[in-house]
């Protein structure tokens, strides 16, 4: 059946069951077999040779192929892309795998149980390599600083996330070894030490992830040479120092800046506001001080709809659509992939030592979907203009020293699904007749607020000024309308009989003369 079939795409159908070599007998002309995203089990004999020896792309991600490494791959000499991720393989990667095909360029071995040191790669044609979510251990020296016979000149994307790698990042990264590298993901390992200065030689770098390690020290100034950076994630480490002023001027292409849970300190420089492409900002859990810069309205990608073109960095060929960013919002962490996170906007300065008032300029960020300023020392009122931030889905202003009433404009946020104003000095009645009553009472505790969902106010007239103003305006309008109606009715009561009763009319006009 289908002896001339060249392309078979069964991807992401959640298919289950057993697949044997008999299913492939007639598929000798197959060039593209894409079936990742299913839960199928492949059961073949140890000496099986696939009939589709001319295959170019093979996608078996999430199939059960293990626990042994599938040796039948060795016969596919023309293959250029192979995905055997999440395949239950607990074996070692055989040495032949790195040069069994002269065409191999894209390899995904992620989410298996490979262990030991990182492999020695002899092929110089690999563009995308994903070894993430395995049990590789040891240091990075041999892998990142290859000898001349192991060139990495074609590599564009390297994923080593969530392994057991340790030691320092070697100071041997260079444009000659990695001239085309755009993605370097070494997050969630046990790496220590400082970021080497040579990182600045990776001029093509677009995504740089080191979150969840044990790295320390300052951000090296050399990183300002990586002017193509879209994403910089140094979260959950022990970095310290100020955010250098050059960050805003040199890395103006940044879309994601995530520095949460470190030891950064000092004030945010006005140069920070030059990050006009920024969509996701996370500086939470540090020691920043000072006021929130008023120039944040210059973060234009948060002000208006993003004009970022994903094709600018060639997502398809570099597989950058698989890159992701973690956003903490609505009290939880969410992971967004690159194709999505350019549409997400988040502003998180929580758990620092920012003080002063929330700048009115913040309310001009009309594209913002998540705002978290909790755990600071902010004072003053919540800006009345907050209702202009129509896209907001999550607001957390808890654990500050904010005072005054909840602005009525907050009820204009139709997409708001998470709100936390607890433990401030807010007072007055929670605006009624809006979704603000649908939030749990815990969102308002630790203040001097009243009204649903809290206890009722002692004085029903104790309503927010804005509601009072609206009520006063309403009453004033009816007062004047009533006067006009009364005036008209009164005159009709006097003049009506004059025109209706002839004797009265005669008497009135006689007196008038």
For each of these PLM feature ranges, what is it?
Residues 454-513:
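Terminal membrane/secretory targeting segments in land-plant proteins
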């Amino acid at each position: 059946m289908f002896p001339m079939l060249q392309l078979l795409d069964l991807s992401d159908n959640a298919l289950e069951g057993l697949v044997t070599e008999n299913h492939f007998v007639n598929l000798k002309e197959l060039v593209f077999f894409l079936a990742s995203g299913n839960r199928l089990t492949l059961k073949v004999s140890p000496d099986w040779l696939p009939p589709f020896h001319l295959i170019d792309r093979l996608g078996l991600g999430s199939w059960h192929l293990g626990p042994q490494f599938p040796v039948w791959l060795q016969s596919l000499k023309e293959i250029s892309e192979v995905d055997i991720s999440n395949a239950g393989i607990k074996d070692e990667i055989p040495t032949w795998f790195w040069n069994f095909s002269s065409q191999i360029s894209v390899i995904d071995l992620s989410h298996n149980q490979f262990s030991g040191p990182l492999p020695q790669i002899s092929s110089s044609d690999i563009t995308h390599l994903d070894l993430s979510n395995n049990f590789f251990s040891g240091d990075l020296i041999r892998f990142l600083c290859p000898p001349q016979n192991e060139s990495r000149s074609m590599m564009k994307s390297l994923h080593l996330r969530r392994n057991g790698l340790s030691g320092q990042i070697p100071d041997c990264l260079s444009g000659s070894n990695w001239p085309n590298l755009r993605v370097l993901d070494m997050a969630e390992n046990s790496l220590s030490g400082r970021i080497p200065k040579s990182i600045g030689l990776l001029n093509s770098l677009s995504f740089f992830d080191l979150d969840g390690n044990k790295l320390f020290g300052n951000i090296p100034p050399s990183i300002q040479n990586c002017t193509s950076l879209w994403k910089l994630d140094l979260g959950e480490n022990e970095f310290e120092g100020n955010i250098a002023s050059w960050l805003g001027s040199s890395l103006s292409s940044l879309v994601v800046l995530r520095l949460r849970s470190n030891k950064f300190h000092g004030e945010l420089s006005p140069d920070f506001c030059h990050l006009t492409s920024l969509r996701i900002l996370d500086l939470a859990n540090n020691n920043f001080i000072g006021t929130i810069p008023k120039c944040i309205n210059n973060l234009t990608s948060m002000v208006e709809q993003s004009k970022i073109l994903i094709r600018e960095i060639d997502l398809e060929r570099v597989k950058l659509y698989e890159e992701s960013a973690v956003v903490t919002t609505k009290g939880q962490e969410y992971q967004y992939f690159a194709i999505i996170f350019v549409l997400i906007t988040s502003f998180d300065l929580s758990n620092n030592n920012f003080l002063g008032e929330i700048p009115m300029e913040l309310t001009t960020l009309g594209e913002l979907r998540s705002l978290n300023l909790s755990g600071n020392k902010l004072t003053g009122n919540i800006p009345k203009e907050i209702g202009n931030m129509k896209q907001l889905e999550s607001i957390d202003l808890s654990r500050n020293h904010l005072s005054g009433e909840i602005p009525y404009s907050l009820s204009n946020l139709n997409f708001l699904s998470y709100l936390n104003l607890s433990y401030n000095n807010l007072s007055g009645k929670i605006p009624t007749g809006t979704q603000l009553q649908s939030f749990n009472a815990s969102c308002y505790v630790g203040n001097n607020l009243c009204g649903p969902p809290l206890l009722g106010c002692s004085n029903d007239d104790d309503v927010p000024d804005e509601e009072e103003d609206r009520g006063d305006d309403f009453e004033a309008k009816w007062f004047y309308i009533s006067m006009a109606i009364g005036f008209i009715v009164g005159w009709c009561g006097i003049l009506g009989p004059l025109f209706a009763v002839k004797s009265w009319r005669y008497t009135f006009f006689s007196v008038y003369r």
